[in-house]
């Protein structure tokens, strides 16, 4: 007996079965997948950062 895992589409909230029958998972459709990609590209979404990265401008891979 196998249980289906159901997740909500991050874009529209529709139920999506997590499995081979849902090729765009966790999204319900290609449309929702592209909407999400567009939001990341437009910087409407971002991963929060706890630190101040202002000192990273002087960073270099070269050894002193």
Swiss-Prot record:
It holds the Pfam family YacG. Residues 45-64 are annotated as: Disordered. Residues 54-64 have a biased composition (Acidic residues). GO terms for molecular function: DNA topoisomerase type II (double strand cut, ATP-hydrolyzing) inhibitor activity; zinc ion binding. Its cofactor is Zn(2+). Keywords: Metal-binding, Zinc. Coiled coil: none annotated. Zn(2+) binds at residues 9, 12, 28, 32. The keyword Methyltransferase does not apply. Belongs to the DNA gyrase inhibitor YacG family. PANTHER family: DNA GYRASE INHIBITOR YACG. This is DNA gyrase inhibitor YacG. It comes from Klebsiella pneumoniae (strain 342). The lineage of its organism: Bacteria, Pseudomonadati, Pseudomonadota, Gammaproteobacteria, Enterobacterales.
């Amino acid at each position: 007996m196998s249980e289906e895992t159901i997740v909500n589409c991050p874009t529209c909230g529709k139920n999506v079965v997590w499995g081979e029958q849902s090729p765009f998972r966790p999204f319900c459709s290609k449309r929702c997948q592209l909407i999400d990609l567009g939001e990341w590209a437009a910087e409407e979404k971002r991963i929060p950062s706890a630190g101040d990265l202002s000192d990273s401008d002087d960073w270099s891979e070269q050894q002193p």
